Amino acid sequence: SVVGEMGMYPLEEAVKLAESFSTRLFVHSTNPPGTMDELVSYLRKGDVLCHMYHGEGENILGKNGITPGIQKARERGVIFDVSQGQGNFSIPIAMEAIKEGFLPDTISTDLNIENWNHPYIFSLLLTMSKLMAMGMSFEEVIRRVTSTAAEIYGEAGKMGTLAEGTCADITILECQQKEVLFRDKYHNELIGNSLLMPMATIIDGQLFY
C-alpha cells in the first residue's frame, strides 16, 4: 500500500478536506491498507472510487461475490469508475463483477504520459471494447462515457447528448467485428469479437479528424 503504516488516516483527512471545500473525493483504491469495505465506509454520496476492478490486495469481491460494504456504498451514492490504467484492472475480477451485475457508473482510462501507448490500455475505445467482451452491451458502455458521466458531474443536458442546441462534440465510431485479444498486468487474457474504432471527431461543430 502506498500509505504504509498510516492506514486509513490519509483517507480520513482527505474526506475532511473535501468536506471543507464542499467537493467530491476521488480515491485510488488499488492495494488498500485494509479491506475494500472499510475503505468505502469513509466515502460519501458523490465520492468516486477509482480502479473498481483492480486485483492488487483486497478487492470488491469476497467469498460470496460483491462484498456487502461495496453494495451498501453503491446504494448510498458512491460512484464506481473503471479508471483502468496500466495495472489497475483485473480481467477475472471485472468479469465476475459484471456477471453479478455490478457494472461501472462511469468508464475512464487513467491514461497518462507514462502509459498512453501501453497495450493493456491504449485508449478509451479499447477499454470500452474490453468491457463489451465481458458482457456489457454497446448501449451500456456508450451511456457510461456520455450521458451518465455528464449527469454525475453536473453537465446533464449540456454534454453527453445530441439534443438540439447543445455543444456538438461528437465521435463517430465503427464497431468492427474481429477477434481481439485483451490482456491485463497479471497475464490474464480475454478474447473478444468486436473492436470500437474512431472514424471521425467533431469538436464544437467542426470536423477535427
Feature-to-residue mapping (PLM):
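C-terminal cap of metal-dependent C-N hydrolases
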Residues: 167-209
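Active-site core of metal-dependent hydrolases
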Residues: 1-118
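Residue-level recognition of alpha-helix initiation/capping sites
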Residues: 8-9, 64, 88, 122, ...
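His/Asp/Glu-enriched, well-ordered alpha-helical/loop segment
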Residues: 92-176
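Short, solvent-exposed coil/turn elements at secondary-structure transition points
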Residues: 55, 86, 147, 176, ...
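Short secondary-structure transition/capping segments
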Residues: 38-43, 71-82, 126-135, 156-160, ...
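Short glycine-rich loop/turn motifs that provide flexible caps or phosphate-binding loops at active sites
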Residues: 45, 164, 204
